[in-house]
Amino acid sequence: LGIVQILVWGGSFFLIAILGGPIIGDTGWSARWVYGALSVGILTSGLLAPLCGRLVSRYGGRFLLSWSGIVVALGLSIMASAGNLGTFMLAWFIIGVGMAMGLYDTLFAALGNLYGQDARHAISRITLISGFCTTLVWPALSFLVEHFGWRHASLIYAAILVVGVFPVYVRVLSTKTGVQEVAKEKATTGSPLGGGLYALMTAAFTGAAVIMTAMSAHLIALLQGQGY
């Protein structure tokens, strides 16, 4: 599951850091719009997150997680054929739908739904493994872009997502659905956060996310600008 997360994160959240420059050079589109497309994906993902959470709670996460790679792959395929900014933004909207379906929030909710408190260990291991995403995906994407161009690189990565995500989730999650009710009974019930604490945590997480997103999108370009 950690490796699958690397694939999905690499094909969505961390993608534009490598493809942004080649896209701008090939199309002549403004850097503001090209890099800003990631915001479209993140906004779409955030708006759909509550719905995905409710679906996981009611039906489990197998369907959403299994199809997330295919949805992101569809977005990448549309992006690869984009001849204008409208199509490019549509591609990132679709990628955002896949992000909502397949990134940490949905996966961790699904694991919690299956295993209750026992999911903590699996979540920790998955987070540790997927933390190597940029270490693995950025060099791989750079290689693909250098040898095939950004459009074909997007299509190749889309194919990897289709092959690598759907079968894993179907196999892993299909055999675990029978323990959902047990996990729910074992889960402890806590009090909801107060308004002030909730607002403070929201502000902290939002600030951290803004910094992380900005750095992940522009880090490669910044380093290249310094001659690295």
Spans of features found by a protein language model:
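Paired intracellular helix-loop junctions of major facilitator superfamily
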Residues: 111-120, 228
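Extracytoplasmic gate region of multi-pass secondary transporters
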Residues: 12-21, 194-228
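Helix-loop-helix hairpin linking two adjacent transmembrane segments in secondary transporters
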Residues: 126-174
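Hydrophobic core of transmembrane alpha-helices in multi-pass small-molecule transporters
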Residues: 6, 75, 86-102, 127, ...
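Extracytoplasmic
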Residues: 2-31, 48-52, 138, 215-220
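C-terminal ends and interior cores of transmembrane alpha-helices
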Residues: 70-83
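Intracellular juxtamembrane helix-capping segments at the cytosolic ends
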Residues: 23, 101-115
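Helix-to-loop junctions at the C-terminal end of transmembrane segments
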Residues: 47-61
